[in-house]
Amino acid sequence: MTSTSSENAPDHDHDHDASSPAPATATAAALPPMIPACDPHDGPACLELIEVLTTRAAAVQRRVLAEVLAMNTGTDYLRRFLGDEVVAAAGGEDELAAAFKERVPVVEYEDVKPYIERIANGAPSSLISSKPITELLTSSGTSGGQPKLMPATEEELDRKTFLYNLLVPVMNKYVEGLDEGRGMYLLFVKPEITTASGMVARPVLTSYYKSRHFRRRPDSPYTRYTSPDAAILCPDSRQSMYAQLLCGLARRGEVLRVGAVFASAFLRAVKFLEGHWRALCADIRAGRADPAVVTDAACRGAVDAVLAARADPDLADAIAAECGGASWRGIVRRLWPRTKYIDVIVTGSMAQYIPLLEFYGGGLPLVSTMYASSESYFGINLRPLDPPEEVVYTLLPNMCYYEFIKVEKDGDGEKVRDGEVVDLVGVEVGAYYELVVTTFTGERVCSPFDFFPTSCMGLSTPSDRKING
């Protein structure tokens, strides 16, 4: 993962109200708001915005922490460490930030878990946040055998949308014509639970796909997918997979990019296709989804609307000819010949799938565009066509407040912290770090991610593999 570079411009933290709308462009003399307006169709403005955020990382980070503290010093959690007397004695934002770093401990999830569980059971959000907690995001990590729960506010969806809006402008620097077709992205929702208080707990991607930010997104060639939303939102993952592949094959000639969030999910789709291509071809010939397979009414109706305009026996025969061949080497490129790249995360634990992706992809570039977790969305890949083993993510300093704890390996290979906490622009090239994240709800929690700085511009992941910045 990469961090951002040190700032080179004077600080103007108060030039804009963080809640006011602003264009994506920003001059060196003014910081953009915390969630800037960002039009993915205006590539130059988006790239300029990235430049402003990253070159002025220190100023942006100071503003993030100031906003976090301005909002949350009255919460039960922060009042334990920053009481009224401490807040009153702080003469300004810098003094309050210093008190935060001195008095608020870096904790593990287990330390804030009791607060989150109380909110899940009906306690007010003000235990940890000045803004209403609207949902709980489940993490892939566990605590006591149960998924970890991360509190989230409505504003977090705005932050995620902002980061998503930056991805296409970056890709457009390297790949032309992405507005001339569709993306075949295989996206899925997972089961959610309702807590005792009635609050929903669900995975971060499920939260986003069910939000108005995704479902009511503006029509754009960059967010035009082969899958109708009803297929993505189908709660039955098997039906969803079948329906999305069916639409992707039916719209074969329009597909310019393919992908899923993780490499493993994309490969599951390829394996599913390998076992079901005959049935999928039969549905394309018939111009409708088999009602015995796609039983979800909304999903089937949306898929049938796609197929009705494309009932094409010749297309089915062409797909069958590719799938029925002696080898599936390069099958992705052969089935979707206009495809320019495969968009999946191939860093960290997903790196093990690179050989299979290369086998099925037939030479298509493997692109990891972003890095995120349940705590926060962190950063983007500014050199997306670099080989997978050289991927570097650039942390966006407006997404949360970042700190780092240097770690060393002892004689047994175990990590040992040195105790010193440094901020985003204070990391040293060549050292390993654990990430500490303070989100806009105010907890200063050690994240399960390790980072390795590759240059003054960033940190890479995973920590056990050197990445050249």
UniProtKB/Swiss-Prot annotation:
Keywords: Ligase
Cysteine pairs bridged by disulfides in the record: none
Pfam families reported for this sequence: GH3 (PF03321), GH3_M (PF23571)
InterPro entries: GH3 (IPR004993), GH3_M (IPR055377)
GO BP terms, alphabetized: response to auxin; response to light stimulus
Kinase among keywords: no
MF term (GO), any: acid-amino acid ligase activity
Biased composition (Basic and acidic residues): 9-18
Residue ranges of coiled coil: none
Keyword 4Fe-4S part of the UniProt annotation: no
Induction of the gene: By auxin.
Entry EC no(s): 6.3.2.-
Annotated spans, Disordered: 1-26
A single GO cellular-component term on record: cytoplasm
PANTHER family (UniProt xref): GH3 DOMAIN-CONTAINING PROTEIN (PTHR31901), INDOLE-3-ACETIC ACID-AMIDO SYNTHETASE GH3.17 (PTHR31901:SF33)
Family that this chain belongs to: Belongs to the IAA-amido conjugating enzyme family.
Known role: May catalyze the synthesis of indole-3-acetic acid (IAA)-amino acid conjugates, providing a mechanism for the plant to cope with the presence of excess auxin.
Name of the protein in question: Probable indole-3-acetic acid-amido synthetase GH3.13
Organism: Oryza sativa subsp. japonica
